[in-house]
């Protein structure tokens, strides 16, 4: 790999258009923020159900909103700084070269100010809940915006693994926002999101392989090849399925959750195995990426609904 390819370059000149609200929203990567907010909601929800405070009143829902918004703002801040640092690499990729951060439509000083304001507001909100929640938010920010973005993404095939540590923080932050401590249910929620991320992002890596190669990003599909990546994806999916089946040991759910987790995991494992016979890796990886989103969304929704129904039936 060309070591100079990953270095930050001067972004392209902007086209003279004014900055818009839409530009700032896109800069914060709203798709990621929405998914992170929902994951934080899932963590808070499980903590609420586990604490048997289902009659907590408006205060609980206010805290839930603060946890979601605070997490969203901190993660948005980290993605803004990620876009700031990645301007040079993004200019080399077809799907990112028109971003306002690359064209110069949003100047670098404005990006820094924007990211700082988002982060400050988010940290204040998380700190208003408890110290642990704010610390977790800060660690997630530093790991993603600094450790992952500035070093591993540019220099190591381990970037996806390292990026999964801050990427899995939202449900943990949401859980601790209510409890103020980390226990086994919190660790399980974190582990599920952590193990979900590598196969999810490697599917993108296989599909966009040549774009990432042009940008000089040392992803696993580029360094080790598609087959080695598929083996890793299969392993992570197998471990994820096993971990998801540990949930009933620590969270009060019915056999419906267990059956659902087993079915969802089995489908993902089947699709992973089918990848070794795929005639078109790009098409296969597109399907894997889509299913990974379906898997995560359904697993968390079923977990939240099932635990709530169980709590209601206990009363």
Curated annotation (Swiss-Prot):
Its main location: membrane. GO terms for biological process: heme O biosynthetic process. It comes from the Bacteria. It is a multi-pass membrane protein. GO terms for cellular component: plasma membrane. Pathway: Porphyrin-containing compound metabolism; heme O biosynthesis; heme O from protoheme: step 1/1. Its EC number is 2.5.1.141. It catalyses: heme b + (2E,6E)-farnesyl diphosphate + H2O = Fe(II)-heme o + diphosphate. InterPro entries: Protohaem_IX_farnesylTrfase, UbiA_prenyltransferase, UbiA_prenylTrfase_CS, UbiA_sf. Keywords: Cell membrane, Heme biosynthesis, Membrane, Transferase, Transmembrane, Transmembrane helix. The chain crosses the membrane at residues 30-50, 56-76, 106-126, 132-152, 162-182, 186-206, 249-269, 289-309. One of its GO terms (molecular function) is protoheme IX farnesyltransferase activity. It is found in: Cell membrane. The keyword Transmembrane applies. Converts heme B (protoheme IX) to heme O by substitution of the vinyl group on carbon 2 of heme B porphyrin ring with a hydroxyethyl farnesyl side group. PANTHER family: PROTOHEME IX FARNESYLTRANSFERASE, MITOCHONDRIAL (PTHR43448:SF2). Carbon 2 of the heme B porphyrin ring is defined according to the Fischer nomenclature. Belongs to the UbiA prenyltransferase family. Protoheme IX farnesyltransferase subfamily. Interacts with CtaA. This is Protoheme IX farnesyltransferase 1. It comes from Bacillus velezensis (strain DSM 23117 / BGSC 10A6 / LMG 26770 / FZB42) (Bacillus amyloliquefaciens subsp. plantarum).
């Amino acid at each position: 790999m060309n070591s100079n390819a990953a270095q930050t370059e001067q972004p392209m000149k902007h086209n003279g258009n004014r900055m818009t609200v839409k530009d700032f929203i896109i800069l914060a990567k709203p798709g990621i923020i929405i998914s992170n907010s929902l994951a934080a909601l899932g963590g808070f929800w499980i903590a609420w159900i586990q604490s048997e405070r289902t009659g907590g009143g408006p205060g609980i829902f206010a805290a839930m909103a603060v946890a979601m918004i605070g997490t969203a703002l901190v993660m948005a801040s980290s993605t803004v700084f990620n876009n700031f640092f990645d301007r040079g690499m993004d200019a080399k990729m077809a799907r990112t070269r028109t971003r306002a951060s690359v064209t110069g439509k949003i100047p670098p000083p404005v990006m820094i100010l924007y990211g700082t304001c988002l982060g400050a507001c988010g940290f204040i909100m998380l700190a208003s809940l408890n110290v642990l929640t704010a610390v977790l938010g800060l660690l997630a920010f530093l790991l993603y915006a600094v450790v992952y973005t500035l070093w591993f993404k540019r220099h190591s095939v381990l970037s996806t693994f390292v990026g999964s540590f801050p990427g899995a923080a939202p449900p943990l932050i949401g859980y601790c926002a209510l409890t103020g401590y980390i226990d086994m249910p919190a660790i399980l929620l974190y582990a599920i999101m952590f193990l979900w991320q590598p196969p999810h992002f490697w599917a993108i890596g296989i599909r966009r392989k040549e774009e990432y190669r042009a940008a000089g990003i040392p992803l696993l599909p580029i360094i080790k090849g598609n087959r080695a990546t598929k083996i890793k994806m299969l392993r992570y999916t197998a471990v994820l399925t096993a971990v998801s089946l540990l949930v009933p040991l620590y969270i009060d759910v019915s056999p419906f959750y267990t059956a659902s987790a087993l079915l969802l995991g089995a489908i993902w494992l089947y699709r992973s195995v089918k990848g070794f016979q795929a005639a078109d890796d790009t098409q296969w990886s597109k399907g894997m990426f889509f299913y990974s989103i379906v898997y995560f969304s359904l697993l968390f929704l079923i977990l939240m609904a099932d635990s709530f129904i169980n709590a209601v039936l206990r009363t």
